[in-house]
């Protein structure tokens, strides 16, 4: 005679209060920019594992995207696995099935699945367009290191979240989540999601200073960086928009102005044939002591 033992277990996780609005948001877009050590990716991983383990969200499936598919293994996949083991401890394998090839995670309670893809070329983008699930529907997408993606990549992903959810679990909703360090102030993500108000968008900001789990040594390290590398600290310490590395001209502002040569006191062209990038020609105007 075989006997089965019933396990009563309640998963537990610790969250940073700063991310409560993020985890409660039901709009279409959650856009999380933040400093290194802010805990944004850890929070998103735990939020997804908590929701996908909950019978209240039966039918929810998640697609996780990095620009390069292979980088998921040591980043998003590892982060989600870590969240499972934090929340379920020694019972993790009783509640979640882990598949290493291809990468996937499946909750044994709800049947909800997590799969991982990349969008580095047209072939991978086409694969994303044909994703289906045996149970439920693709309703959530997580783009980690989202600044690696082109706007066209995200548009393809966004198009995957469509169709009425009538007849399915009423708790389900479509949502794209992006997490990233805001490297460039000219990035398309800033223009699309941060520079104008949109009721479908939650644009969230966090830093290591709001992470209650950060250790004192890391905090001191970031304070040293503030003195030694102010621009790097702005991006990786404060989570502000900026530019890092490779810039020749760093002190400039972006404005609209007339490019007619007659509008300047002097005008010059310069050419850079480029070792790493394509040939470039730069027009420089001089007017009243200002360079354009």
Predicted regions located by residue number:
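Nucleic-acid-processing active sites and adjacent nucleic-acid-binding tracks
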Residues: 283-292
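Walker B catalytic acidic pair
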Residues: 144-145
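Conserved RecA-like ASCE P-loop NTPase motor core of nucleic-acid helicases/translocases
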Residues: 60-72
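Walker A/P-loop NTP-binding motif
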Residues: 41-58
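ATPase catalytic-site recognition across NTP-hydrolyzing enzymes
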Residues: 211-273
């Amino acid at each position: 005679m075989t006997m089965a033992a019933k396990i009563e277990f309640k998963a537990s996780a610790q969250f940073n209060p700063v991310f409560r609005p993020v985890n409660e948001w039901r709009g279409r877009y959650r856009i999380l920019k933040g400093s290194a050590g802010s805990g944004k990716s850890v929070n998103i991983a735990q939020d997804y594992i908590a929701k996908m383990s909950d019978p209240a969200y039966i039918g929810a499936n998640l697609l996780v995207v990095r620009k390069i598919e292979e980088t998921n293994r040591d980043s998003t996949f590892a982060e989600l696995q870590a969240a499972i083991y934090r929340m379920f401890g020694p019972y993790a394998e009783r509640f979640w099935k882990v598949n290493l090839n291809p990468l996937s995670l499946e909750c044994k309670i709800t049947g909800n699945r997590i799969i991982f893809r990349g969008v580095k070329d047209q072939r991978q983008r086409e694969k994303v367009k044909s994703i289906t699930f045996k149970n439920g529907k693709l309703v959530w997408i997580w783009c980690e290191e989202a600044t690696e993606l082109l706007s066209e990549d995200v548009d393809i992903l966004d198009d995957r979240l469509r169709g009425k959810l009538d007849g399915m679990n009423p708790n389900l909703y479509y949502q794209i989540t992006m997490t990233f360090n805001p490297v460039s102030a000219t990035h398309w993500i800033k223009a699309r999601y941060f520079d104008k108000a949109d009721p479908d968008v939650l644009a969230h900001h966090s830093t290591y200073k709001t992470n209650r789990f950060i250790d004192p040594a890391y905090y001191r390290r970031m304070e040293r960086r503030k003195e030694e590398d102010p621009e790097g600290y702005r991006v990786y310490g404060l989570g502000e928009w900026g530019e890092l590395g490779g810039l020749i001209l760093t002190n400039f502002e972006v404005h609209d102005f007339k490019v007619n040569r007659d509008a300047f006191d002097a005008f010059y062209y310069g050419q850079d044939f480029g070792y790493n990038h394509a040939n470039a020609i730069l027009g420089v105007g001089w007017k009243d002591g200002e360079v354009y």
